[in-house]
Amino acid sequence: MPRVKRSVTARARHKKVLKLAKGYRGRRKNIYRIAKQAVMKAGQYAYRDRRQRKRQFRALWIARINAAVRELGMTYSTFMNGLKKSGIGLDRKVLADLAVFDKAAFEKITNQVKTSLAN
């Protein structure tokens, strides 16, 4: 059986990992063994944080809606309850956007919610 030399594939694999580690500090950017570990850990963080990003944005939207609704004399939970009862089908992302950039429209929605809760 012929001898297999792996220089071409090994070099390609090393180049690929070191390219991914570009911009890292210290030996993490130019020592293959350390760079490989750093790239693996970066991938784990990326995987985890893609899921956490969704939670963090939802929390941000809720905080913005809560702040805007409290200025108008309601709490977040009563506002969301009234929103469901009044049949307004806006999600938290759109509501938070309205609360920040279009206060007049958000105030109209809040008034609709208040009237639906009063009935």
From Swiss-Prot:
One of its GO terms (biological process) is ribosomal large subunit assembly. InterPro entries: Ribosomal_bL20, RIBOSOMAL_L20_CS, Ribosomal_protein_bL20_C. One of its GO terms (molecular function) is rRNA binding. Keywords: Ribonucleoprotein, Ribosomal protein, RNA-binding, rRNA-binding. SUPFAM superfamilies: Ribosomal protein L20 (SSF74731). Gene3D superfamilies: 6.10.160.10, Ribosomal protein L20. GO terms for cellular component: ribonucleoprotein complex; ribosome. HAMAP family: Ribosomal_bL20. NCBIfam families: rplT_bact (TIGR01032). Binds directly to 23S ribosomal RNA and is necessary for the in vitro assembly process of the 50S ribosomal subunit. It is not involved in the protein synthesizing functions of that subunit. Belongs to the bacterial ribosomal protein bL20 family. This is Large ribosomal subunit protein bL20. It comes from Nitrosomonas eutropha (strain DSM 101675 / C91 / Nm57).
